[in-house]
């Protein structure tokens, strides 16, 4: 008795097609590249700059120069992995109310010879339904 190979061939083709999909779509919770202009990335970056300035012992504010790279991961919410360049400003940290992100971004830069640039890696955990963001990791050099 001769059997048709058609029923076996269709599932095999489907399996091959699935194997050709990009790996990020097949790994739940895996890192995915994000556009640095994405509004969620911009929000996480602004939060990172504010937190950096709140936690650092620097006498002057540092502002965002640019977002070099952004990735995200779906967790209970979203985790953003950001590589950013920050630049020291002329705005001294006062003992009064700390500046917010938009105010920091308006701070002037010192003359070229006195500029200090940092490359920072931030991890930000966002849970929009709780209206909460948390800086889970930060390293700058």
UniProtKB/Swiss-Prot annotation:
GO terms for cellular component: extracellular exosome. The keyword Lipid metabolism does not apply. Expressed at a low level by the venom gland (at protein level). Residues 1-26 form the signal peptide. A motif (Secondary area of contact) lies at residues 73-77. It comes from Micropechis ikaheca (New Guinean small-eyed snake). InterPro entries: Cystatin_dom, Cystatin_sf, Prot_inh_cystat_CS. Inhibits various C1 cysteine proteases including cathepsin L, papain and cathepsin B. This protein has no toxic activity and its function in the venom is unknown. It may play a role as a housekeeping or regulatory protein. Residues 29-129 form the Cystatin domain. Belongs to the cystatin family. It is found in: Secreted. GO terms for molecular function: cysteine-type endopeptidase inhibitor activity. Negative results: the recombinant protein does not inhibit calpain-1 (CAPN1), a C2 family cysteine protease and legumain (LGMN), a C13 family cysteine protease. Does not provoke cell death (PC3 prostate cancer cells). Disulfide bonds join 91-107, 120-140. The record marks 29 as: Reactive site. It holds the Pfam family Cystatin. This is Cystatin. Keywords: Disulfide bond, Protease inhibitor, Secreted, Signal, Thiol protease inhibitor.
């Amino acid at each position: 008795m001769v059997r048709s190979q058609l029923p076996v061939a269709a599932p095999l083709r489907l399996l091959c097609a699935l194997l050709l999909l990009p790996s990020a779509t097949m790994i739940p919770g895996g890192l995915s590249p994000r556009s640095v202009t994405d509004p969620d990335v911009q929000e996480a970056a602004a939060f990172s700059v504010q937190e950096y300035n709140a936690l650092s012992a620097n006498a002057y504010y540092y502002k965002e120069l640019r977002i070099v790279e952004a990735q995200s991961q779906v967790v209970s919410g979203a985790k953003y992995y950001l590589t950013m360049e920050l630049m020291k400003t002329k705005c001294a940290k006062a003992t009064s109310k700390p500046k917010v992100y938009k105010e920091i971004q308006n701070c002037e830069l010192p003359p070229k010879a006195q500029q200090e640039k940092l490359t920072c890696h931030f991890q930000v955990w966002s849970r929009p339904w709780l209206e909460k963001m948390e800086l889970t990791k930060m390293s700058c050099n």
